[in-house]
């Protein structure tokens, strides 16, 4: 849309002329804030109900306005929200359509309210919904992780540090590590939700209002725990959006790490997993290719989500109290991050649930890289009463010898081992299998299969999949 127009009927009384084409274009937020229409209708209905209850508007006008808002909502649901840049945003778009439907009574809706507290309320409601959706999606991802971990509580694979073979672990233990990460993500969203669940509605432009409103009534109607306590802070606060983005960014990092592992595991040199066809793509030139594109996009999306957080932090860093138009730019990064996060959660949930783990390849890989070297050192500590640092040195010598011969530790003869340290005897071989290694890691939170099964059982109770014994 371009060109000049008449002065805006919502605020144009003190202007001699209308905004220029560039002003209309830079000022319009309806292309993106139309996403708030459900929240805007809900907040307006709560507001007009309160106005009627307080006698600020007549009961007849309050009922007429509420009915009209329902009509507007039905139109939006059926046909979408129209984009008229002259009306700037979702608030004025809705009020304008309401006036067309019910006449002058629509003008009473904005009594004791400003767009400043209106948008702060709408946006909080939207972010609260986004937090709830993220929490639900993450719970489903946890369900998938716990289910697969239970299947593979005893499936042995190499554990890595620096992407080098470190110690044998079980696949179930590895998957439960992500269960823990995702649990922390859920708690971050839950914590943020508690902090943000106060209603700014009724703060008006910045100083409150002289009308005898009941902010507790509107807060309760909208599911808030109560009203905010400072009108200046209420209209200028975007901490709730930043809290959401911080939680989303941290969550996206965890999803990216999980995606990266699936990408590595699906590569031919590893061959630990076959990804579902439904979450993979092919090559336009190489017929044999099966690319982990969904996982790669999850990994890429994490960068964009972190960028959304950075964008809003920079927008907010130097704003004086109270409202500034810069804050109109608060919504696009939140909307983008929420969309990307939802896609990423869904993709990784499907990947975990449908992946085919090649446990034979994992088991074979666990035999490589002298993964049971620590078990030899631990055996020396327990059986020969050797200080760990000395045992570490002895084990290093054994690894060096085995490596020079191209064999595994348990393929060294007892004579070879005794030549390194005469305190070693045949009992050591029982400690050098990968099965013995994982079984020995039975400390709380360890990789021993029984310990993994215990953690899985506790997780199933926590997720509501079964009752506590």
UniProtKB/Swiss-Prot annotation:
Pathway: Amino-acid biosynthesis; L-arginine biosynthesis; L-arginine from L-ornithine and carbamoyl phosphate: step 3/3. SUPFAM superfamilies: L-aspartase-like (SSF48557). GO terms for biological process: arginine biosynthetic process via ornithine; L-arginine biosynthetic process. It is an enzyme of class 4 (lyase). InterPro entries: Arg_succ_lyase_C (IPR029419), Argininosuccinate_lyase (IPR009049), Fumarase/histidase_N (IPR024083), Fumarate_lyase_CS (IPR020557), Fumarate_lyase_fam (IPR000362), Fumarate_lyase_N (IPR022761), L-Aspartase-like (IPR008948). The keyword Amino-acid biosynthesis applies. The keyword Lyase applies. It catalyses: 2-(N(omega)-L-arginino)succinate = fumarate + L-arginine. Keywords: Amino-acid biosynthesis, Arginine biosynthesis, Cytoplasm, Lyase. Pfam families: ASL_C2 (PF14698), Lyase_1 (PF00206). Its EC number is 4.3.2.1. GO terms for molecular function: argininosuccinate lyase activity. Its main location: cytoplasm. GO terms for cellular component: cytosol. It is found in: Cytoplasm. NCBIfam families: argH. Belongs to the lyase 1 family. Argininosuccinate lyase subfamily. HAMAP family: Arg_succ_lyase (MF_00006). This is Argininosuccinate lyase. It comes from Novosphingobium aromaticivorans (strain ATCC 700278 / DSM 12444 / CCUG 56034 / CIP 105152 / NBRC 16084 / F199). The lineage of its organism: Bacteria, Pseudomonadati, Pseudomonadota, Alphaproteobacteria, Sphingomonadales. The gene is argH.
